[in-house]
């Protein structure tokens, strides 16, 4: 198991390192293209890549700590670091999109209030869109391949793959739409071409903001200590019940939490007979091995008690 964890961490590190430098290149390219083309959409794209670059650095450090054994200063290990990372990563992405909406809205307001709006330069946009979409597609495939090789358990790789898809969608959508704006000249929409990129930004934001919002809601539930998904809980409880039956113990219930790729399971049981500490340890080891196969990496605690550990309403 330790060898597998080391291999998975190596795969994750390699994928994140490639993503880090790719995003740094895309950040500079996006900001340079925004300056050359006077496009807010390109600026948003560049800022999004800059956030991805900074996040990749943090993700690599956090990924190396996940799964380490508890210490005196971190008695519960580092597993929740991954959840914290994904939570704040989602918040930052939401913040970038909100900032982009504000910039686009300001440009539209300036236009309709009679202010001056700079004319777009379309030349640099075409080259940028082709190069960046190709890079984002490659990154998304690289992250997803690493995600599968690590057993589909890394929330970091899953989040980065989604971020690469969003970045590619931003580049493709904004690039294609911006390049189509000159064709509106001479039509009823011709007078609005100067704010075309601002409108495109707002449409793209409405299309993709649901992804970081959904991720934020999921990780917030993990941080709040809400029970793991029903399917995961059912598998853990079934495994605990089976092992308890084999040992002749009475199974009360299992409490299951999820922290990124790690699961936390507490099993409440009543041996209904005198037991030694090493027998409880043997039960824990047998169940831990079974849970590892059923639901993935697990930290397990066993509570020997006559009750199920739940608060019951007073009669």
PLM features per residue range, with description:
Residues 2-5, 11-18, 41, 55-65, ...:
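Alpha-helical transmembrane segments and adjacent TM-loop junctions that form the membrane-embedded core
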Residues 17-30, 101:
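The first (N-terminal) embedded transmembrane alpha-helix
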Residues 30, 35, 298-300:
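Generic low-polarity alpha-helical segments
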Residues 32-45:
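Short, hydrophobic transmembrane alpha-helix segments
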Residues 48:
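Active-site cores that bind ATP or allylic diphosphates and position pyrophosphate for catalysis
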């Amino acid at each position: 198991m330790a060898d597998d964890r080391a291999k998975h961490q190596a795969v994750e590190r390699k994928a994140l390192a490639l993503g880090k430098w790719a995003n740094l290149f895309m950040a500079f390219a996006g900001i340079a293209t925004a300056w050359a083309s006077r496009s807010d959409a390109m600026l948003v794209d560049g800022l999004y890549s800059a956030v991805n670059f900074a996040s990749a650095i943090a993700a690599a450090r956090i990924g190396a700590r996940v799964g380490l054994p508890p210490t005196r200063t971190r008695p519960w290990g580092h597993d929740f670091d991954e959840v914290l990372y994904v939570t704040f990563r989602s918040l930052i992405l939401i913040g970038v999109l909100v900032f982009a909406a504000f910039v686009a809205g300001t440009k539209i307001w300036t236009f309709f209030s009679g202010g001056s709006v700079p004319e777009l330069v379309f030349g640099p946009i075409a080259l940028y869109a082709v190069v960046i979409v190709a890079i984002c597609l490659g990154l998304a495939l690289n992250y997803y391949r690493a995600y599968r090789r690590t057993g589909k358990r890394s929330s970091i790789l899953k989040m980065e793959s989604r971020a690469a898809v969003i970045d590619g969608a931003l580049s493709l959508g904004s690039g294609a739409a911006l390049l189509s704006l000159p064709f509106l000249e001479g039509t009823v929409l011709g007078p609005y071409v100067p704010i075309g990129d601002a409108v495109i930004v707002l449409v793209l934001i409405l299309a993709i903001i649901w992804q970081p919002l959904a991720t934020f809601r999921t990780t917030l539930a993990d941080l709040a200590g809400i029970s793991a998904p029903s399917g995961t809980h059912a598998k853990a409880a079934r495994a605990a019940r089976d092992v308890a039956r084999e040992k002749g113990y009475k199974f009360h219930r299992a409490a299951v939490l999820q922290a990124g790729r790690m699961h936390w399971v507490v099993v409440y049981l009543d041996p209904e007979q005198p037991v030694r500490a090493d027998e409880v340890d043997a039960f824990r080891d047998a169940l831990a091995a079974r849970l590892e196969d059923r639901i993935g990496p697990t930290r397990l605690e066993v509570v020997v008690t006559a009750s199920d550990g739940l608060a019951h309403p007073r009669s």
